[in-house]
């Protein structure tokens, strides 16, 4: 079947932003500073389908950003052990490291039925998570430093209620009042969710534990569970407006 323009509205946008900061050696030696590169990609999609009193709005937004800076790390030998010089001082290397500073995507689906000019009733479903692995710090990006990844965590919010939409184009505020709401938190990765330890037995047969990484359970207290559900009520306020004839600025 053909897509009818009078029933469908589609918006799509995206952007790529980058910055480069560079200092020469004399400046760094006197005032300090570090050369760096930052890249951020943004994408947004909005689709609205309307038929009589029924409307369903679907939105997707995503943001992913990385930056690269020089960091000081201790040199390792062939066996992976930290190296020191004859005086016992650490042997340090300087290298450029990429590190994630922004990573999120959000999917929203909102079906509704119109009650009056500005009021409607329906539901809102929001899901958000991230694309790539997240680590403890710029210099700690190994498996034992893993803190997050896709669906660890993941958040799902479902609400039922009424929605008010402002009739003024210059003040497009949307207020959703939901007496019934459900919040779900997911942490699917066992390695991240649980505390990881290494057990060793000494010469006397005594067992000792060395922590490899702490638990990042995102509020899920039971280590054998991968999700948590909570109920309640919610209020959501949205304001989405573009400025300028070409919509160069959006808030």
Annotate the PLM regions.
Residues 5, 48-52, 112-120, 167-170, ...:
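Outer-membrane beta-barrel channels and translocator barrels
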Residues 12-14, 58, 123, 160, ...:
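Membrane-embedded beta-strand positions of outer-membrane beta-barrel proteins
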Residues 16-18, 41-49, 107-113, 127, ...:
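Residues on the lipid-exposed face of transmembrane beta-strands in outer-membrane beta-barrel proteins
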Residues 16-24, 51-53, 62-68, 125-133, ...:
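Transmembrane beta-strands of outer-membrane beta-barrel pores
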Residues 23-29, 69-84, 134-141, 187-194:
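Outer-membrane beta-barrel translocator domains and adjoining extracellular loop/strand segments
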Residues 24-33, 79-81, 86-97, 142-149, ...:
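Extracellular loop and loop/strand-boundary signature of outer-membrane beta-barrel proteins
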Residues 33-41, 99-105, 152-158, 227-233:
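Residues that define the transmembrane beta-barrel architecture of outer-membrane proteins
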Residues 178, 182-251:
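Outer-membrane beta-barrel transmembrane domain signature
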């Amino acid at each position: 079947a053909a897509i009818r323009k009078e029933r469908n509205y589609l918006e799509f946008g995206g952007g790529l932003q980058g910055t480069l900061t560079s200092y020469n050696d004399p400046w760094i030696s006197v005032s300090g500073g570090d050369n760096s590169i930052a890249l951020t990609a943004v994408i947004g999609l909005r689709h609205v389908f309307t038929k009589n009193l029924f409307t369903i709005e679907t939105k997707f937004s995503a943001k992913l950003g990385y930056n690269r800076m020089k960091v000081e790390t201790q040199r390792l030998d062939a066996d992976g052990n930290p190296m020191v010089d004859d005086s016992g001082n650490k042997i340090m290397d300087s290298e450029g490291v990429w590190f994630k500073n922004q990573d999120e995507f959000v999917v929203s689906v909102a079906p509704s039925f119109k009650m009056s000019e500005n009021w409607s009733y329906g539901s809102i479903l929001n899901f958000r998570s991230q694309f790539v692995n997240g680590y403890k710090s710029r210099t700690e990006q190994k498996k034992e430093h893993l803190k997050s990844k896709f669906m660890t965590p993941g958040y799902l919010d479902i609400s039922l209620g009424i929605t008010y939409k402002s009739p003024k184009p210059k003040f497009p505020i949307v207020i959703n009042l939901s007496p019934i709401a459900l919040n779900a938190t997911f942490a699917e990765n066992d390695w991240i969710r649980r505390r990881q330890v290494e057990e060793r037995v000494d010469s006397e047969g005594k067992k000792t534990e060395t922590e490899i990484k702490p638990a990042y359970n995102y509020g899920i207290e039971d280590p054998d569970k991968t999700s948590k559900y909570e109920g309640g009520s919610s209020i959501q306020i949205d304001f989405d407006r573009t400025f300028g004839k070409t919509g160069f600025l959006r808030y």
